Amino acid sequence: MEPNNHHDGLNGQKADNPLEVAIVGGGLTGLALALGLLRRNVNFTIYERAASFGELGVGIHFTPNAERAMKALDPRILQSYVDVATHAEGGFLSFVDGLHDDDLLFQLRMGEGYKAARRCDIVSQLVKHIPQERVQLLKWLQSVEEDAEGRAVLTFRDGSTAKADVVVGCDGIRSQVRSAMFGSGPSAPRAQYAHQLAFRGLVPMAKVAATLGPEKTSRAIGYLGPGGFVLSVPLAGINMMHLEVFVMDPLPWSDDTTGSKPDKDKDEDDVKRYVLPSTRAEAEKAFTEFNPTVRSLISLLPEELGKWAIFDMLDSPAPSYALGRMCLAGDAAHASTPNQGGGAGAGMEDSLVLAEILAALADRAKSGARVGSWEISEGLKIYSDARYERAQWLVQSSRRVAQLFTRKKGAGQGGEEEEPISREILERSHQLWDYDVDAAVEEALGKLRAKVLEKH
């Protein structure tokens, strides 16, 4: 869908209207929302706590629904991804028997084909399109309060403050905006350990070809088996294979910072909480019963590597994605496991719905009509209502997909089990991919018009 006649914001100059949006967090969701607002001529400032833009993690891929949302937000977002992505041979993500003989179980073909890229490469492309004056780095949010006029006042750890009409938390699984909305106590919504961990690394294509043959370097493959699975995705642009080794873990996540330091100190090294030092031997230990292909792939990982805890918000979800002048998008709203490949794409859908609602409110403000606390609050509630059911479904579904990938019976041990597993995964995949985000936007805008824009 095309944005609603807001193409005059592409030059990056501040729009001549009173609505100001604070985007807290400059990851993929925050940058995509920023470009969507820029295209729709809505004022915004990104407040990023780091000294530069970056993304945790290595590889990423976007499903067809996400690509449609990216194009509708701003075609440059989708193009930024396409420009740095590698297309898998045949356009398929193939799933094979990782326990026995590499037999093909099923394939998923997504839209124009499966492709993947490095997160940092996409971020680097997106940042090129955002004017520097719209960005504030080293801004670590401390609190959000209201001033006497009802506007939001953001206070940062360096003592500086900023005012905004809308605050959007795109600040990830440990969202400070979410804490400002719902608190940070034991009963507050938060990301929790999903009892899944991952070992991740990049392996030179030449090593993969020498060990397993050149045919393994051009295909995206998932090796499935009891208790774990391995994904190998080619990144041809850098001649590397991205390996992700996932292990289901019934134990609590033990990290060396939780409960041992004040919150401020814990926050200042998030990576220590979610990524612990580990070894290739630990990863190999979890896959001793898998076939030689899987064991050989894992043997190509570096001797020392990180062990990533996978967190999601299934067990402690946010009751809403909006409260007053604040709202959440992406992982801050609905962090999910990576098993269905839909988490980042859900952030793109969030950004599109939110950008269209904020553009409609900004147009109202430019016309001289009132856009105060009530109008903004109602608009953000409509955004939350538009996104909540689908995003929470994804969190649950992604957990379920991991259960299917790591079924206790090995693949090839009975056709009765294999068919429903592949069928359910395909059904869940199409529920993710076939979503009509344009219709969701139109429905949300219709509610906004009926409740806010045409009432006053």
Curated annotation (Swiss-Prot):
Glycosites: 43
One Gene Ontology CC term in the entry: membrane
Transmembrane feature ranges: 18-38
Location of the protein in the cell: Membrane
Main location: membrane
Cofactor field: FAD
InterPro entries tied to this protein: FAD-bd, FAD/NAD-bd_sf, FAD_monoxygenase
EC top class named in words: oxidoreductase
Top-level taxon of the source organism: Eukaryota
Role noted for this protein: FAD-dependent monooxygenase; part of the SOR gene cluster that mediates the biosynthesis of sorbicillinoids, a diverse group of yellow secondary metabolites that restrict growth of competing pathogenic fungi but not of bacteria. Sorbicillinoids biosynthesis requires the action of two PKSs. The SOR cluster is required for the production of trichodimerol and dihydrotrichotetronin, with sor2 being sufficient for production of trichodimerol, but not dihydrotrichotetronin in the light.
Alphabetic keyword roster: FAD, Flavoprotein, Glycoprotein, Membrane, Monooxygenase, Oxidoreductase, Transmembrane, Transmembrane helix
This protein's name: FAD-dependent monooxygenase sor5
Keyword Nucleus: no
Disulfide pattern: none
